[in-house]
Each structure stands twice: as structure tokens, then as C-alpha cells.
Amino acid sequence: MFASRLAALGLLLLALVLDGKPAPPPQPLRKAPAGGTTALQRQLTEQQQQQQQAEGSSGPAAGGGGGRSGSKTANAAPTAPKSKGAAASAASRLLRDLRPDGKQSRAAWGRMVHPEHHAGGGGGGGGGGSRRLKGLPKKGLGSGCFGLKLDRIGSMSGLGC
């Protein structure tokens, strides 16, 4: 009983501390380009070209006045390919994730695009009980011992005839 009162008091104090401040507005989501993967590839190649142009223009400016600063420029040169490689690997990773090559990604894409076809379990299009609703096969409809239907194996269950 004491614990429930303590919890109620804690909730009341929490409400007073928050003082009804509204939550910050959610940030709008960035929309994907309308062209799908090809538009994204174009956008990535444009970004890579811009990065290469920026690196190319900063290269001669970073050289400086010459003299003894050669060691500093030699240390700066390996960092440019690393960043370029990192950007290229990130871009290729994005494109690899978007590419529907494998069976799993194609199946997932098909389920997303056509959810009505994949509503239930089981095979054969439709819900899970589509096989249950079908009738028995014609050869199973023949009468077995004592006029009872035979099961799928073709033997009578428990009657032994």
C-alpha cells in the first residue's frame, strides 16, 4: 500500500517536472528519388564526382610554398585515397543492398509489392487453408472396407482389412 502511494507521488512529481512541455516536432523524412535504384545510382555518382573535384582542387593548394614541408604533404597524400575508398565502399554497399539479385531479396520484394498474394501460409497462392478446402482426390473416394473411405496411404486406419 505504501509502495503504491509512493509510485503515485513519483508520477505526480514527474508530471509537474515535465510541466506539459510539448515534444519536439518530428523531423520530416527524406523522400527517395522517384526513379528508384537508377536515380540513386546517379545521385551517388554525382556525389562522388563532387568529392573528387573537391579533392582535386584542394590538392595543389595544400602543397604550399615548397621547401621543407614535403614531409607534411607526403603524409597528407595517403589520407585522400582512404577517404575516397571509404566513400566508394559506402556507395557500393548501398547499391548492393538495393540490388534484388538473390532469391531472398527478390522474394522479400515480391511480398512487399504484392501482399495480397502472400497473405497466408502454405503453398499454392492464397491463405493458409487453401489446401484444406479442396476435396479429396477421386481415387481416395472409393469405398474401402465396410464402405468407409480409405486414408491417403490406401490402408484402413485401425480396421486391418
UniProtKB/Swiss-Prot annotation:
Q: Known Pfam families for this protein?
A: ANP
Per the UniProt entry, the propeptide covers 23-139
List where in the cell it is found: Secreted
Q: Where is the composition biased (Low complexity)?
A: 29-60, 76-93
Name which cysteines form disulfide bonds. 145-161
Q: Where is the composition biased (Basic and acidic residues)?
A: 94-104
Q: Which GO terms describe its cellular component?
A: extracellular region
Give the tissue specificity. Expressed by the venom gland.
Signal peptide residues on this chain, from the entry's feature table: 1-22
- Which molecular function terms from Gene Ontology are attached? hormone activity; toxin activity
- Asked if Disulfide bond is a keyword of the record, the answer is yes
Q: Which InterPro entries match?
A: Natr_peptide, Natr_peptide_CS
List the biased-composition ranges (Gly residues).
120-130
- Using the UniProt annotation, give all residue ranges assigned to the region (Disordered): 19-135
Q: Name one GO biological process term.
A: regulation of blood pressure
Q: Which UniProt keywords apply?
A: Cleavage on pair of basic residues, Disulfide bond, Hypotensive agent, Secreted, Signal, Toxin, Vasoactive, Vasodilator
Q: Which family does it belong to?
A: Belongs to the natriuretic peptide family.
Role played: Snake venom natriuretic peptide that has a vasorelaxant activity in rat aortic strips and a diuretic potency in anesthetized rats. May act by activating natriuretic receptors (NPR1 and/or NPR2).
PANTHER family with a match to the protein in the record: C-TYPE NATRIURETIC PEPTIDE
Q: What is this protein called?
A: C-type natriuretic peptide
